[in-house]
Amino acid sequence: MSTAQLVVQHLPYLRRYARALTGSQVAGDAYVAATLETLVNEPETLGRSTNVKADLFRVFTRIWNSLSVNGHSDQVQHDLPAEVRLGQITPLPRQAFLLSCLEGFSEEDAGVILDVDVSKVRDLVDEAGRELAADMATEILIIEDEPLIAMDLEALVEGLGHNVIGVARTRTEAVKIASESKRPGLILADIQLADGSSGLDAVNDLLKTFEVPVIFITAYPERFLTGERPEPAFLIAKPFQPANVSAVISQALFFQQSARRREAHNA
């Protein structure tokens, strides 16, 4: 398989990381586009190692950090929404946290990507975990038709200090629970539900009445990370690792709370 084919193979996961880092599909995809443009113009930046995925993320990180400070790409800046201002100052600990917990990179690979040593990666991940866990407990609605997965998710989020207001197996149940319970501060949603209904449709129904961050869970993430249509900013692949879910929940709540603080400040 050629290097170009390997890069294409890893793009869905780079998009996932970029969107989690910025909290936005538009912003994340803009940084990915800038990374691909760099690879086209400067193919030598990818290096000659056998770990193409780590090299791809390393190039992305270089672009991310340079644009965050200098904003030298007018095209990318014009594509970025207002909320990406927060993403542009996302600290190094959060990058280490997502690389390790969301993308599953080893400490060694995360160190190469971030240009730090392994001990620094460990310190950064620990720091991010403390930072993101602070003062973020919320009510969570789970939309999942597989009982065992629903039980795992419920135990996981409660272990993080959150409260599950209900578990829905269908679109109709999700709307009913949301209308009869305390408004959720976060939704975890499968995409394909038991009765053939869609978790996407269930979420869209709920978002008509209130705004809430949503994390989608699917066995086919590549179908929803093509960059060709409106897509989830937060996506977890099945089978999932508890650390992945924890990382994405923390990130989603972080961006939600930061957005509210900015709104209050600007009011």
Swiss-Prot record:
One of the protein's GO biological processes: phosphorelay signal transduction system
Superkingdom, taxonomy of origin: Bacteria
Keywords for the protein's UniProt record, in alphabetical order: Phosphoprotein, Transcription, Transcription regulation
Pfam families hit by this protein: PhyR_sigma-like, PhyR_sigma2, Response_reg
Function: Key regulator for adaptation to epiphytic life (leaf colonizing) of the bacterium. Positively regulates several genes including katE, sodA, hsp20, dps and gloA. However, it is not known whether this regulation is direct or indirect. Also induces several dehydrogenases.
UniProt cross-references to NCBIfam families, sorted A to Z: PRK09191.1 (NF006623)
Protein name listed in UniProt: Phyllosphere-induced regulator PhyR
Species the sequence originates in: Methylorubrum extorquens (strain ATCC 14718 / DSM 1338 / JCM 2805 / NCIMB 9133 / AM1)
Name of the gene encoding the protein in the UniProt record: phyR
